């Protein structure tokens, strides 16, 4: 049995042999597995909606353990809290413990989107911009998972 990585997000550090044009070094990829424990595969992102990547065919079978070992594991997209206050030029800052959404660019670099509450809004919800801040890997590795419960829009579901 091949020694291949767990399912999840990764950044390539080397091109995939035989697929250098489609899976070069320095890109975001998803390692997945076919249903029922089938073959593992690697795929580049297709679409980004609401700061999250979505994947689709074609996928590439993952058969190179040596290349797989070169992948850099990335934390899951989703919600986290900041482990420290971040200061930005112009005096802006995001405080320690702020809720942020983690996403990635196509190169597999982390992007944070800070939660905002709109004082003049009518809904009791947090908003996340579609523009975030690139972060260094050392911060990426220290983010604290925020277990925010995903739900469906009950009003939209009732109207279906």
Regions found by a protein language model. Give the residues of each.
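Intrinsically disordered, low-complexity, charged/polar segments
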Residues: 44-76, 113-160
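A short beta-strand micro-motif
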Residues: 8-13, 80-84
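N-terminal helix-cap/turn-to-beta initiation motif at the start of protein domains
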Residues: 1-7, 69-78
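Residue-level detector of functional hotspots within protein domains
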Residues: 2, 15, 66, 86
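Basic/aromatic-rich interaction segments and small domains that mediate binding to polyanionic partners
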Residues: 11-57, 89-134
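Transition segments tied to proteolytic processing and entry into folded domains
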Residues: 2-8, 18, 25, 147-154
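Short, solvent-exposed interaction modules
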Residues: 72-90
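A general marker of short, structured functional hotspots
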Residues: 6, 26, 76, 84, ...
């Amino acid at each position: 049995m091949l020694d291949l990585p767990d399912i999840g997000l990764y950044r390539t550090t080397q091109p995939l042999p035989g697929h250098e044009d489609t899976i070069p070094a320095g890109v975001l990829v998803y390692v997945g597995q076919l249903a029922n424990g089938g073959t593992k595969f690697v795929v580049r992102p297709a679409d980004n909606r609401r700061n999250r990547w979505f994947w689709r065919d074609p996928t590439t079978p993952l058969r190179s353990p040596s290349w797989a070992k070169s992948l850099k594991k990335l934390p899951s997209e989703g919600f986290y809290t900041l482990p420290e206050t971040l200061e930005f030029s112009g005096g802006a800052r995001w405080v320690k413990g702020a809720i942020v959404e983690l996403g990635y660019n196509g190169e597999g670099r982390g992007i944070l989107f800070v939660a905002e509450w709109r004082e003049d809004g009518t809904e009791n919800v947090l908003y996340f911009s579609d523009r975030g801040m690139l972060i260094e890997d050392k911060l990426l590795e220290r983010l604290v998972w925020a277990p925010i419960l995903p739900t469906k829009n009950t009003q939209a579901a009732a109207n279906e």
